[in-house]
Each structure stands twice: as structure tokens, then as C-alpha cells.
Design a protein with these regions (language model features):
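Alpha-helical transmembrane segments
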Residues: 4-15, 46-50, 73-80
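Internal/C-terminal transmembrane anchor helices
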Residues: 68-97
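Membrane-interface helix-boundary motifs at transmembrane edges
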Residues: 1-6, 35, 61-75
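Membrane-embedded alpha-helical segments of integral membrane proteins
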Residues: 11-63
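Alpha-helical transmembrane signal-anchor/signal-peptide segments
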Residues: 92-117
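Extracytosolic and intramembrane catalytic regions of membrane-associated proteins
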Residues: 108-170
Length: 170
């Protein structure tokens, strides 16, 4: 039972570390966003903390009573030092990049909605970079909410169509 528990913990720790890497290195290639903008602004910091705790947890789980005392002390201290890596990466580099995790949405306006599916809309999103507020970015996106917490957003160009299910929001 203990072995199953430790293997499950190791699996979750590795999953959080992979999630951190994919989110910050490849996250702009995915079109899934949080619908709650307040939570979305806190999520990178939560993910950084979970990754650091996961790295430290993997080192702690590597401590064995059969090892010599100095080896366990090295694992304990080394785990703490390696757990600082996500904090240093985020606060030293990622925090100052103007990527999707640093975009602050100033205004979001729905211009069309689908009369067949209420979860599909076309929005104009005005966002500004969280690090320097000088550059304002306007995007027209197709948004499809697939759970109460997530939505998919893809860039779209608006074209006039005769027979469409889209209705203009007034």
C-alpha cells in the first residue's frame, strides 16, 4: 500500500513538472484559456509553486533509511536547492516576457453569438502586456466555452455570409 502511495505521489509530481514545462514553453500553441480571468492571472504563480513542491517532493521521496546519513542530508538540501529552479525561471525570465500568461485583458466585447449554440461567440479582446502597459493589442477571436472553467479561443477574420447562424449583439 505504501509503495502504491509513493508511486502515485511520484506520478503527480512528474505531471506537475511536465505541466510547468509545457505551459511556459509551448503554451501559446494551445488555444485553451481559463474563463475566470482573475484565476487565470494567479495560475502561473500557482503552477510555479506546485512545480517547486513537486521537485522537492521527489527528492524527499528518494530519501531512504538504508542510505548513509550524509547522503540523506544531501538529498534533503539538494532537493531544496533544485526546488528553487522554477522560482528562478519564472521570476528571472518568464515573468518579464510579454506572452499569453502576462496578457492582462482590459476589455472584452462580444460582437456575435451563435443562435444554434449559446457557448460559441465572436469577441473583440483588448489586452495589454502586464510588464509594460505601452502596447495595446486588439484581437478578434472565436470563443467556444466547453466547460464552465475553460474556453477555446482561435483568431478569426469576419466575413459576410448569407445563411449563417450568427447574430449581431446589440
Amino acid at each position: 500500500m505504501f509503495r502504491l502511495f509513493t508511486n502515485t505521489l511520484k506520478f503527480f509530481c512528474i505531471a506537475f513538472i511536465i505541466w510547468f514545462a509545457v505551459y511556459f514553453l509551448l503554451g501559446d500553441r494551445f488555444s485553451i484559456y481559463f474563463t475566470d480571468r482573475v484565476f487565470a492571472s494567479y495560475f502561473p504563480e500557482i503552477l510555479v509553486f506546485l512545480t517547486a513542491a513537486s521537485i522537492y517532493g521527489l527528492f524527499i521521496l528518494a530519501i531512504k533509511s538504508s542510505y548513509k546519513k550524509w547522503q540523506n542530508i544531501l538529498l534533503f538540501i539538494g532537493g531544496f536547492l533544485f526546488a528553487l529552479t522554477p522560482f528562478l525561471a519564472y521570476h528571472g525570465y518568464f515573468q518579464y516576457q510579454c506572452d499569453f500568461w502576462n496578457q492582462e485583458i482590459k476589455e472584452e466585447k462580444t460582437i456575435y453569438f451563435n443562435s444554434q449554440n449559446k457557448f460559441e461567440t465572436v469577441k473583440v479582446i483588448q489586452s495589454v502586456c502586464g510588464t509594460d502597459n505601452s502596447e495595446i493589442k486588439l484581437d478578434t477571436v472565436f470563443s467556444k466555452q466547453f466547460t464552465p472553467y475553460f474556453e477555446m479561443q482561435n483568431p478569426v477574420k469576419i466575413q459576410k455570409v448569407e445563411n449563417a447562424d450568427w447574430t449581431v449583439v446589440k
